Regions:
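Short, membrane-exposed interhelical loops at transmembrane-helix boundaries
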Residues: 236-238
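Short S/T/G/P-rich N-terminal loop/turn motif that feeds into the first structured element of a domain
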Residues: 23-106, 110-233, 243-263
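Bacterial Sec-dependent N-terminal signal peptides
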Residues: 1-26
Length: 263
């Protein structure tokens, strides 16, 4: 009985250790998308630059991204904020941490104490993602072009079902032994990806998203030509196990980073 109990406890310890190890390696990303008017932009940007991002860094979040649309949407002005979290616990606790930070509250006073008659923004949309194990951490792009000229391509692949979404993710991250995966092809051609991830909470699911980055529009076009003409992609896209309409909607959003963006 003692031996059996010892073995059971040992097995549980191994399982718990494995679970902790996996969780420790997984990064979660939040996109906060501000819907706001042009007149509201200065207040939100000052809050992000002077209060929010410094407070996040004090809380252990090393890099935060802030992006705008290259071609503004005149009907729905947006500002994108990208925050990587080391765990779901860190994500869950962040608002409490900020609320206890007096320096944050002073620096963000105009934004935080805005009246309903003079709002700081229209609304905030939130997307929560889990990093793929093939790229468990975000990467700061290794680009040398001016930030205002860069093209950050945010892609969203929606699937018609959870099963087909899993198939698309497998094509994206595993592929096959001979040709590799989509992610491998991106890496081969140096697409300077910030992240690859699965949406775990948002208005568009099931869904995978990723962000690749380029010095400018010509650089973007040249990289995609390499990808589309890659012989491994020619095979991978036609494999029967990855057929069957795994993507029902492919959205592309073209962004550029603001000067105070870490990404």
């Amino acid at each position: 009985m003692k031996i059996r109990s010892f073995l059971l406890l040992s097995a549980l310890a191994v399982c718990m250790s494995f679970s902790t190890s996996v969780n420790a390696q997984t990064t979660y990303y939040q996109f906060k998308i501000y819907h706001l008017s042009k007149a509201q932009e200065p207040v939100v940007e000052n809050y992000l630059k002077s209060a929010y991002i410094p407070a996040l860094k004090k809380a252990g979040i090393a890099n935060v991204g802030v992006f705008k649309l290259i071609t503004p949407d005149t009907l729905d002005n947006k500002l994108y904020v990208f925050v990587p979290y080391n765990s779901l616990t860190q994500f869950d606790n962040v608002n409490s941490v900020l609320a206890a930070d007096n320096q944050y509250k002073v620096a963000g006073k105009e934004y935080l104490e805005a009246l309903s008659t003079n709002r700081s923004y229209g609304r905030i949309e939130s997307i929560l993602l889990r990093a793929f194990s093939a790229m468990p951490k975000p990467a700061v792009p290794k680009l040398n072009g001016p930030k205002a000229q860069r093209v950050y391509e945010l892609r969203s692949y929606e699937s018609p079902s959870e099963t087909l979404a899993a198939t698309k993710i497998k094509q994206f991250t595993v592929g096959n032994k001979e040709n590799g995966s989509e992610l491998d092809i991106f890496t081969k051609h140096n697409f300077n990806a910030v992240f690859y991830a699965e949406v775990i909470s948002g208005s568009k699911m099931p869904n995978l998203m990723y962000m690749t980055t380029f010095n400018n529009a010509a650089d973007q076009e040249a990289h995609w030509a390499l990808f589309n003409n890659d012989p491994n992609w020619a095979v991978l896209r036609r494999l029967p196990e990855y057929g069957g309409g795994t993507v029902s909607k492919n959205e592309r959003t073209y962004l550029y980073p603001l000067e105070y963006s870490d990404f």
